[in-house]
């Protein structure tokens, strides 16, 4: 029998929440603003949790170098903020998993590369995150995932 864990940390995008459609919708809006073809869900699905840089790279392809990437990121984040939880859902079994951790008095938290202001906008949409003990966002500490600082700061 395994010992009871002292705590559990989860990633957010692509682990607890399926945010791919809302992230992809923001990407496609930015592409539309620049008269670029939209990007299919099947193309961006596995890239969505890589954040704005990865999405812009797949959406703009070789033409990304023709643009100010920081301006594109700002436009992307502005649009994503407006529609942060339209199609986002928790993955199957997550509510039950978190409820079980809570029932067993196992503290749990989230370590994400999503900026804090977006994390704080998104999490309240999901009741299952009410018992979350700690949230470390991409800009909470000096280093973000995959650097171990987020884990070692616990």
Regions flagged by a language model, labelled:
Residues 1-46:
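Active-site neighborhood of HAD-like aspartate-dependent phosphohydrolases
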Residues 24, 28, 45, 49-57, ...:
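An amphipathic alpha-helix signature
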Residues 27, 94-124:
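Substrate-recognition element of Asp-dependent hydrolases with the DxDx(T/V) motif
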Residues 30-31, 51-65, 122, 154:
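Helix-loop "lid/cap" segments that line or gate small-molecule binding pockets
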Residues 57-99, 104:
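Metal-dependent phosphoesterase signature
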Residues 86-89, 115-154:
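Substrate-recognition "cap/lid" segment bordering the active-site pocket of phosphatases
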């Amino acid at each position: 029998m395994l010992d009871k864990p002292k705590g559990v940390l989860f990633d957010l995008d692509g682990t607890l929440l399926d945010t791919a459609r809302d992230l992809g919708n923001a990407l496609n809006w930015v592409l539309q603003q620049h008269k670029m073809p939209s990007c299919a869900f099947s193309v961006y699905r596995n890239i969505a949790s890589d954040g704005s840089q990865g999405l812009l790279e797949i959406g703009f392809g070789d033409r990304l170098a023709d643009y100010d990437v920081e301006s594109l990121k700002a436009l992307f984040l502005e649009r994503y903020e407006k529609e942060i939880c339209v199609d986002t859902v928790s993955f199957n079994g997550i509510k039950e998993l978190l409820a079980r951790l809570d029932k067993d008095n196992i503290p749990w938290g989230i370590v994400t590369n999503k900026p804090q202001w977006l994390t704080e906008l998104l999490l309240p949409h999901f009741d299952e995150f009410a018992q979350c003990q700690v949230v470390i966002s991409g800009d909470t500490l000096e280093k973000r995932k995959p650097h171990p600082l987020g884990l070692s700061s616990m």
